[in-house]
């Protein structure tokens, strides 16, 4: 009975539950039917892309949308306030003579995105601050007021994605149009000034890519490009279309400790403003640029054993390179492993082929460091694009671009500079061995740049010119103590100098020293940043007593004659004379050595380059006039910070340059010029430039004689200039063509300076200082010196320059001499030339009255 009652209860409950389930199911079905009948609400995000042809690139980073020639970023809100880097590079061009593929924006932009009201704003972090220690809340508040982050650009918010995890905004103005934020077009091309005017209406977006840490936007931009030489327009504006790749990359929150710069080291750097502690003054701090190399086995490294780095520097080699190029490229890159082995790193650098099976590999992804092959008409030397975290100086990635016509460049250099000595290069093309040797040389130097090293143009000046003609010396020491010098081949070696090395040997002692300073590992758990700095500073103190281990900063090239690009040896006059002998041999044999060149195109390019090289030699020697040697050394080293070039060498250099200019056309091969298609002889053109160069040297002499009154003075400069240029007047004879051109240049400059000084009350020498200022007074830097500072002392040119007085005195003497000369029996052309000079002098004197 009891069992029956229990069963009855269960039956009742079961029925009730069943009824409830049926009712719920019915309601749910009704709700489903209702939801199906009601359309889903369309969001702003949906409408933004609805019925539009959209190209989308997705990744963990930023999703990029391209539609209607516009670019939209879909930025995860988790990336707001995360620092990023904006850069640009040239990827193609319609005019390789003006624009070089691989050229990059000079200053990548550090920024972050933030939301302000209804806009996304692009802010630049005030990353000049570097806090060495924990600061107080009050100091932090004061810093926040005085070092705010600036807003560079704003973008209207178009929508949020459907789960509101990302914001969508239009970045076409930033990444789809030419922008002043990151200008990629050149402003100089050799001696020519370049002006590029963007044509926004002719801008087109070619493609987009998105990776885990960066995005790429590829564009075609059209510019109106014009050239000028010394402010004189050369031709009209010409349309030039360039491929421009913009990249936005996430800056990693690197844990690498910065290395405090020493200005005596030739390494690139990032600048910060140090805030040491409350109550102390700010100070400028510089971090060297370097890869984060940490030994895999720290204990073995500490014992002096060769150790693999935990993360070696890996470069991916483009598989489109000609097969014969790949080995010299590898050798050029891996040459630097010799320097890393000296400081305990084994296989610090690797070169591997483009992966065939790694699905996520893309050479356009800037997190991969690649060596790219660029099919281009440009015969430029390789260039590199380096991405640095400015917060620490860590090099995150670097890529090299090698142009398909680099063989032409190497052939030109090798034939012109060594053809007089080396019969094996006297042909239309270099042999495979000579080309491989040259390619390795170029790659080695550019790899140095990708490791953070700067050019060291003064290195070769530490070798005597005579030593460069010595077989034993050049075999052992090479052509310079650094591959970072601008030395191609040994152009001073003569045909009688048997066994002399003609090409660089590889890394020099300076390169080993610089890699040691920049990449020596310090265990951050045991060595503080200050102890590291002090150890390295003492290391440099000891090494730079040897001039061959010094860094000669390019920023001082305006004054220091050792820093003239292309110079070889310590005696510029001797080197120039030897080089000119070799160039004459090559020039006279071009028709014999270069075959199968019916249109003379190859020979004309070589002939033009020889004339340009001769002009470069002239400028190298002229750099002694008004020059000073600038030495970045501690006072305790007892080496003067600046030392004016001796009076004897300045005067000898000026007289050499005057004679060279007046007789420069003797080098011209008129028979060759008549056979070809040369519209104007470069030798004729160069003479005009030489006149301006000679006149400009007076300003440098004004400064150096002010600094050292016992050196070559402006009066002595003008006396030598006058007595040499107007010797034909004193001898009452017709001037040579060279004399006539230089006399006109002198008269033009004299008229400008004297008339300006008397007619307008100003100084013909200009105003202000001709020196770079010493920099902000921000206190002492943690490392030795300031790597951004020009070493030349500051001098107000108006105190030193007396050009108008000396020009005026010269004109007085010249007027008397011309009046006497015109009484002689002169050819009509000479008489007309002298009469015109006398007329101009009298006009100037009228102003004086």
Regions found by a protein language model. Name each.
Residues 14-24:
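Bacterial N-terminal signal peptides
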Residues 28-30:
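Boundary at the C-terminal end of the N-terminal hydrophobic targeting segment
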Residues 33-321, 339, 343, 354-407, ...:
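Auxiliary tRNA-acceptor-end handling modules of aminoacyl-tRNA synthetases
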Residues 334-345, 444, 448-449, 489, ...:
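Sec-exported extracytoplasmic/periplasmic mature domains
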Residues 353-374, 437-494:
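The catalytic-center signature of Zn2+-dependent metalloproteases
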Residues 459-849:
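Conserved catalytic/binding loops enriched for acidic/polar residues
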């Amino acid at each position: 009975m009891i069992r029956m009652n229990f069963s009855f209860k269960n039956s009742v409950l079961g029925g009730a539950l069943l009824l409830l389930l049926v009712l719920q199911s019915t309601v749910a079905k009704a709700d489903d039917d209702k939801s199906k009948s009601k359309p889903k609400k369309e969001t702003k995000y949906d409408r933004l892309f609805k019925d539009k042809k959209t190209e989308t690139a997705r990744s963990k980073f930023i999703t990029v949308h391209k539609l209607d020639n516009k670019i939209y970023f879909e930025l995860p809100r988790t990336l707001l306030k995360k620092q990023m880097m904006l850069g640009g590079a040239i990827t193609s061009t319609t005019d390789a003579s003006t624009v070089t593929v691989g050229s990059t924006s000079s200053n990548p932009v550090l920024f972050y995105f933030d939301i302000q009201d209804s806009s996304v704003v692009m802010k630049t972090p005030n990353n000049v601050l570097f806090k060495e220690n924990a600061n107080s809340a009050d100091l932090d508040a004061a810093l926040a007021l005085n070092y705010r982050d600036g807003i560079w650009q704003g973008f209207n918010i178009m929508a949020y994605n459907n789960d509101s995890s990302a914001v969508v905004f239009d970045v076409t103005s930033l990444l789809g149009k030419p922008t002043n934020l990151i200008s990629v077009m050149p402003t100089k091309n050799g001696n020519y000034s370049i002006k590029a005017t963007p044509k926004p209406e002719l801008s087109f977006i070619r493609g987009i890519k998105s990776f885990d840490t960066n995005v790429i936007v590829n564009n075609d931009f059209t510019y109106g490009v014009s050239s000028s030489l010394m402010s004189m327009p050369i031709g009209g504006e010409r349309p030039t279309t360039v491929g421009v790749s913009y990249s936005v990359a996430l800056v990693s929150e690197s844990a690498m400790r910065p290395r405090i710069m020493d200005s005596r080291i030739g390494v690139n750097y990032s600048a910060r403003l140090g805030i040491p502690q409350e109550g102390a003054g700010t100070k400028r701090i510089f971090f060297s640029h370097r890869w984060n190399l940490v030994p895999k086995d720290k204990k073995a490294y500490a014992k002096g054993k060769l150790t693999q780095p935990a993360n070696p520097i890996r470069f991916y080699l483009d598989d489109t390179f000609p097969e014969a190029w790949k080995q010299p490229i590898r050798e050029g890159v891996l040459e630097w492993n010799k320097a890393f082995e000296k400081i305990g790193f084994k296989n610090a650098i690797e070169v591997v082929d483009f992966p065939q099976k790694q699905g996520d590999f893309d050479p356009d992804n800037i997190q991969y460091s690649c060596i790219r092959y660029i099919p281009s008409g440009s015969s430029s030397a390789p260039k590199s694009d380096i991405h640095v975290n400015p917060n620490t100086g860590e090099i995150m990635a670097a890529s090299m671009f090698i142009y398909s016509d680099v063989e032409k460049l190497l052939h030109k250099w090798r034939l012109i500079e060594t053809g007089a000595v080396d019969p094996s290069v006297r042909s239309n093309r270099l042999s495979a061995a000579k080309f491989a040797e040259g390619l390795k040389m170029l790659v080695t130097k550019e790899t140095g740049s990708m490791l953070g090293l700067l050019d060291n143009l003064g290195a070769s000046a530490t070798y005597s010119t005579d030593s460069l003609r010595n077989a034993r010396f050049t075999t052992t020491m090479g052509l310079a103590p650094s591959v970072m010098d601008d030395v191609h081949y040994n152009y001073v070696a003569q045909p009688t100098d048997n066994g002399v090395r003609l090409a660089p040997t590889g890394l020099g002692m300076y390169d080993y020293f610089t890699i040691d300073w920049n990449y020596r590992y310090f265990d951050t758990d045991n060595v503080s940043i200050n102890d590291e700095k002090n150890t390295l500073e003492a290391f440099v103190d000891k090494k730079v007593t040897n001039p061959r281990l010094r860094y000669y900063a390019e920023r001082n090239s305006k004054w220091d004659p050792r820093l003239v690009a292309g110079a070889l040896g310590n005696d510029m006059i001797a080197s120039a004379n030897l080089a000119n002998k070799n160039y004459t041999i090559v020039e006279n044999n071009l028709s014999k050595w270069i075959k199968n060149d019916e249109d003379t195109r190859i020979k004309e390019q070589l002939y033009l380059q020889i004339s340009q090289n001769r002009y470069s030699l002239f400028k190298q020697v002229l750099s002694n006039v008004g020059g000073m040697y600038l030495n970045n050394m501690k006072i305790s080293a007892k080496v003067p910070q600046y030392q004016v070039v001796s009076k004897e060498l300045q005067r000898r250099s000026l007289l050499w340059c005057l004679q060279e200019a007046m007789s420069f056309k003797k080098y011209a091969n008129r028979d060759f010029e008549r056979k070809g298609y040369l519209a104007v002889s470069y030798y004729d053109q160069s003479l005009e430039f030489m006149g301006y160069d000679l006149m400009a040297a007076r300003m440098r002499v004004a400064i150096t004689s002010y600094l050292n009154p016992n050196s070559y003075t402006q009066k002595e400069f003008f006396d030598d200039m006058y007595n040499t240029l107007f010797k034909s007047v004193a001898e009452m004879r017709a001037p040579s063509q060279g004399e006539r051109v230089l006399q006109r240049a002198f008269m033009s400059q004299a008229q400008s300076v004297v008339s300006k000084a008397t007619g307008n009350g100003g100084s013909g020498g200009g105003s202000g200082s001709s020196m770079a200022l010493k920099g902000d007074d921000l206190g002492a830097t943690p490392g030795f010196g300031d790597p951004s500072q020009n070493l030349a002392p500051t001098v107000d040119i108006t105190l030193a320059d007396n050009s108008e007085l000396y020009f005026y005195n010269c004109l007085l003497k010249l007027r008397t001499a011309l009046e006497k000369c015109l009484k002689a029996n002169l050819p009509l052309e000479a008489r007309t030339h002298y009469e015109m000079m006398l007329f101009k002098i009298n006009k100037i004197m009228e102003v004086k009255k």
